[in-house]
UniProtKB/Swiss-Prot annotation:
Gene Ontology biological-process annotations: mitochondrial electron transport, cytochrome c to oxygen
One Pfam short name: COX3
UniProt organism field: Oncorhynchus mykiss
Protein name: Cytochrome c oxidase subunit 3
Gene that specifies this protein: mt-co3
Spans through the membrane: 16-34, 41-66, 73-105, 129-152, 156-183, 191-223, 233-256
InterPro entries: Cyt_c/ubiquinol_Oxase_su3 (IPR024791), Cyt_c_oxase_su3_dom (IPR033945), Cyt_c_oxidase-like_su3 (IPR000298), Cyt_c_oxidase_su3-like_sf (IPR035973), Cyt_c_oxidase_su3_a-hlx (IPR013833)
Amino acid sequence: MAHQAHAYHMVDPSPWPLTGAIAALLLTSGTAVWFHFHSLTLLTLGNILLLLTMYQWWRDIIREGTFQGHHTPPVQKGLRYGMILFITSEVFFFLGFFWAFYHASLAPTPELGGCWPPAGITTLDPFEVPLLNTAVLLASGVTVTWAHHSIMEGERKQTIQALTLTILLGFYFTFLQGMEYYEAPFTIADGVYGSTFFVATGFHGLHVIIGSTFLAVCLLRQVQYHFTSEHHFGFEAAAWYWHFVDVVWLFLYVSIYWWGS
């Protein structure tokens, strides 16, 4: 390896951005094909390619940051800014869903019966499963903060316990959301209410799955002694993402489940 007289990481050529982009194309087009033609082939291929890309890209970053020492303080600063900008872009992504929901609900058209929820729609009780889901996610926010403080204080066992609990709560939330979808008295095809409900809560559910995976990787790394009290940005980024998912759910709960019902 050539000598470098600066603290910045010159990244080696990598195939993973390309394979990740192809996986994203297959996932989005595969979802459309699944909706319209009931074929899961493209969606399955996209998922397999995405999982392979995630595994190998994360593996390479761990090698560069943990074992080769490329993640110097200036590089970590850049990663922090990158994560902040990514979460900001996600805020605007969800803002679009809230905009669609409020556009439809604040001035319902005659086609909807001039009321919200639209005529013929039976809404979900906000004080049953949705309230339980809120409690589960808020509890997971507490446990991920516990894990963060444990890492900073060098409490290895407590970090593992707190991370495990957070991941289990994330999986429990996903299970409850899946049951709610299965038993819902309306579908994504039931007009603007069904589409805004399932798209907004569905994308949030997808983010919970992504966040749970992110935290699971952090748990494996913690077990392998990758994190120290000074060097643990991989976990910090996962914790920021998880808190973002928590906050989005609170807005979804208040807007769609409680006010919207």
